[in-house]
């Protein structure tokens, strides 16, 4: 409105905490869900189908593949040492060919001490990830500095685009049906709700962690592409085309 100045400086910061304290807002969010929270609390209604990451694009699995080309962890850290509305989110993804599988997730409103503990616990759960990407923002560098002697494979991730730009970059992977979520995981519904509302949901940590995982995976996927196999497929296609042409000539 005219003359209104929004003094908030961080994503998820409350406008009037003296009227609606953090605990009350969190309780409302849990009861309403991500979709209703965006409409009722943020006054940002979003269509059920639409936006960058549409709900009906996701694929689902009940059993993981026996092996992957590689597995990695992705972490989105909070901005403060105190428990606030900002979430810490860690995800594990397995990559096999053109497909990716969401293996597990841990998420909470933690200070840096609890965040470090959760990173250690998550890293010790199978299937194990050799690389663990942490965005070079918020508490990310501090967590790496604290845990580098305890947890192997911690790597800084330096985003080259905005949150929306990153989501647009990986959206075609979802739209093409190459991203699989665990059908029965309790956190999947909240993940898809946040993704469907992105970037208008109050919290975007799950989407940010997801996009970071897939952008970090791009160079690793190129390493696992077998050029000989691709050449074999192309040669096979040429032979089949030649056979069809010869058959037509005989007719």
Residue ranges of predicted features:
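Nucleic-acid-processing active sites and adjacent nucleic-acid-binding tracks
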Residues: 91-134
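Gly/Thr-rich phosphate-binding beta-strand-loop-beta motif of the actin/hexokinase/Hsp70
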Residues: 65-95, 209
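A general structural signal for well-ordered alpha-helical packing
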Residues: 38, 71, 87, 116-119
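C-terminal nuclease/phosphodiesterase catalytic domains that cleave nucleic-acid phosphodiester bonds
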Residues: 35, 39-44, 81-85, 91, ...
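Short His-Asn-centered micro-motif
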Residues: 75, 134-137
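ATPase catalytic-site recognition across NTP-hydrolyzing enzymes
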Residues: 2-77
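Conserved inter-motif catalytic segment of the P-loop NTP-binding fold
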Residues: 5-19, 103-104, 118-122, 147, ...
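Conserved phosphate-coordination/catalytic loops
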Residues: 52-54, 109-114, 138, 161
């Amino acid at each position: 409105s005219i003359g209104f100045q929004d003094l908030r400086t961080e994503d998820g910061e409350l406008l009037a905490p003296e009227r609606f304290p953090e605990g009350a807002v969190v309780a409302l969010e849990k009861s309403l869900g991500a979709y209703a929270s965006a409409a009722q609390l943020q006054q940002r209604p979003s269509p059920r189908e639409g936006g960058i990451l549409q709900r009906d694009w996701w694929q689902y699995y009940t059993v993981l593949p026996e092996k992957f080309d590689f597995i990695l962890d992705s972490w989105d850290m909070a901005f403060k040492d105190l428990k606030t509305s900002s979430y810490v989110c860690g995800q594990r993804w397995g990559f096999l060919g053109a497909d990716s599988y969401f293996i597990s997730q841990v998420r909470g409103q933690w200070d840096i001490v609890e965040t470090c503990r959760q990173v250690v616990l998550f890293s010790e759960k199978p299937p194990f990830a050799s690389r663990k990407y942490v965005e070079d923002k918020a508490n990310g560098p501090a967590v790496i500095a604290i845990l580098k002697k305890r947890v192997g494979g911690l790597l800084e991730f330096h985003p080259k685009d905005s949150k929306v730009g990153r989501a647009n970059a990986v959206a075609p992977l979802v739209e093409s049906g190459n991203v699989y979520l665990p059908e029965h995981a309790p956190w999947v519904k909240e993940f898809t709700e946040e993704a469907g509302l992105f970037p208008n949901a109050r919290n975007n940590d799950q989407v940010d962690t997801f996009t970071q995982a897939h952008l970090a995976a791009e160079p690793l996927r190129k390493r696992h592409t077998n050029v000989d196999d691709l050449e074999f497929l192309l040669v096979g296609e040429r032979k089949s085309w030649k056979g069809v042409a010869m058959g037509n000539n005989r007719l």
